[in-house]
Amino acid sequence: METMSDYSKEVSEALSALRGELSALSAAISNTVRAGSYSAPVAKDCKAGHCDSKAVLKSLSRSARDLDSAVEAVSSNCEWASSGYGKQIARALRDDAVRVKREVESTRDAVDVVTPSCCVQGLAEEAGKLSEMAAVYRCMATVFETADSHGVREMLAKVDGLKQTMSGFKRLLGKTAEIDGLSDSVIRLGRSIGEVLPATEGKAMRDLVKQCERLNGLVVDGSRKVEEQCSKLRDMASQSYVVADLASQYDVLGGKAQEALSASDALEQAAAVALRAKAAADAVAKSLDSLDVKKLDRLLEQASAVSGLLAKKNDLDAVVTSLAGLEALVAKKDELYKICAAVNSVDKSKLELLNVKPDRLKSLTEQTVVVSQMTTALATFNEDKLDSVLGKYMQMHRFLGMATQLKLMSDSLAEFQPAKMAQMAAAASQLKDFLTDQTVSRLEKVSAAVDATDVTKYASAFSDGGMVSDMTKAYETVKAFAAVVNSLDSKKLKLVAECAKK
């Protein structure tokens, strides 16, 4: 669990890291300002008031120093966080410091690598951002200077107390309807008792009247205390304006002013409830004047029986809820029958051939279209076509095995000079017929193709563990799979898919 010391430590570390980045930023800006001569930017590329590069850089450096000093003032007063709102403020300060640190790092990196003449406008915007941040932190520092740590802690403790009081009062107001119903029930009970029971005289009745008078006095005293508490709450609510002023300094306290403003209406409602309760007590006191003690005892016995019945209200509600769920289940019996019929219609032997596991049933049914397409593709193959394809691969393999001889032949032909080749052609008519332009062109193309061929790649493809070998080994497996898929009933597969989805 996080303690306030942890929050103070995190805030101090975050602000310390931020001050370090600000110092580095100031140093980078100073180095840029002290750099060599540079060309002034064009006036049309700068905003009004930011065309002087050195002025902009000095303004940025000054804003960074102001923000550094303001952050130091805030971090020196970080021990005030001692309440719920203090935790929120500390967390917000920590997050804000980390965010500003990231922006300062990006700004420092930009200053280190970019010349002043081409980043004036961007640095001017960064100077404006830092100025706004410095203004916010200076405002916070002013608050900490005007109120010491003890005063701030006391104020936040009052705010927490007010929040707890308001939450309790909201819970009380949530029972207004129950109080109104109880008051109406008491009034109706008093009237019915007064109409049914005759007036009775005697000592017992006088004692009962005295008890009623004492009860009335207690009710009046309780009403007076409630009104006093309401007035105290109104006084506390009047302090909400002070809380609202403080909330304007902290984003985390922004929503509390509205709650304080609405507290007066809630207090007036509570006073009205108290007045109605007092009126109900007066009506009961008047009705008790004509009560008979024995009949009152019988009524109290009946009231205890009624209270026992009301105590079982939760059990009755649970029974009603269970019945509602049972009705919803019965309403879906037709769908359950359809599911059972679909499951019973599945061929058990074909399902065993598929070797479908429960965790794979859904994925298999979702891939019905893919299986159908694959089945159609496999059906177009036969053994003759597959043997023909493999034969062509073997021919290519034998041709590639002669790559060394072809390369030696091309090298030998390349060593001959055209004059010598012409002499050989004149001496042998067969050689002359062979060495035509078309033949030489073909040999050159063959030589280029051989040079561009990766022999090791094809050799690995046709090896014992290569791709072609795997294809030949998997032929029987693919053929068996195609036979099983072709034997399936598409209607039953659709029913299985519907069952898996439901």
From Swiss-Prot:
Protein name listed in UniProt: Uncharacterized protein 017L
| Taxonomic source organism | Frog virus 3 (isolate Goorha)
